[in-house]
């Protein structure tokens, strides 16, 4: 009985955490930063990065302050983006951000300004630092021009 209850609790918590990484085709900011996570099914680093988002405590905590959208580059879908409900496809988004490989992360502040684009895998320390800067922009703590110093001060060069 305990085993069944424990398994059920783990399943529920796993399903709850998956909601952090959104596969929705309506991409909105809801007054948060936005992360577009270009992935593919055959990408081992995408799997590692998704696991980092869900299991690394510090990264998970800051990630909850963003709307994160998974965009599978091998699946052609139609997307509705932002308040203006701009219509995009997987291909048009890939072309707009020159996303030829995966993972490819594109981070926006809450005003839809592109702040960072990270091609390839970034470990939890790096990813957390990038997200902290964008969150600081959203909270008015930093100006976009301060990104180089912020990254350097936080061990990212």
Can you describe what each PLM-predicted range is?
Residues 62-87:
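Thiol-based oxidoreductase modules, predominantly thioredoxin-like and allied folds used
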Residues 97-100, 115-124, 128-157:
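Non-globular targeting/processing and membrane-anchoring segments
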Residues 41-48, 103-106:
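C-type cytochrome heme c attachment motif
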Residues 93, 101-117:
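A short, hydrophobic beta-strand/beta-hairpin element that forms part of a small beta-sheet core
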Residues 4-13:
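Sec-dependent N-terminal signal peptides
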Residues 30-43:
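Short active-site neighborhood of thiol/selenol oxidoreductases, capturing the structured segment around
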């Amino acid at each position: 009985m305990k085993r069944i209850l424990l398994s059920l609790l783990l399943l529920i918590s796993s399903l709850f955490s998956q909601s952090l990484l959104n596969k929705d085709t309506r991409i909105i900011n809801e007054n948060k930063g936005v992360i577009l996570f270009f992935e593919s099914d055959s990408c081992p680093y995408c799997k590692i990065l998704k696991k980092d988002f869900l299991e690394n405590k510090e990264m998970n905590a800051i990630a909850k302050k963003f709307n994160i959208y998974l965009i599978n580059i091998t699946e052609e879908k139609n997307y509705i983006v932002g308040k203006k409900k701009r219509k995009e496809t997987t291909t048009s988004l890939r072309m707009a951000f020159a996303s030829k490989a995966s993972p490819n992360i594109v981070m926006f502040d809450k005003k839809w300004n592109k702040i960072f684009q990270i091609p390839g895998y970034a470990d939890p320390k790096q990813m957390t630092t990038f997200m902290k800067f964008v969150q600081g922009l959203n909270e008015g703590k930093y100006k976009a021009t301060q990104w180089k110093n912020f990254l350097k001060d936080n061990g990212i060069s």
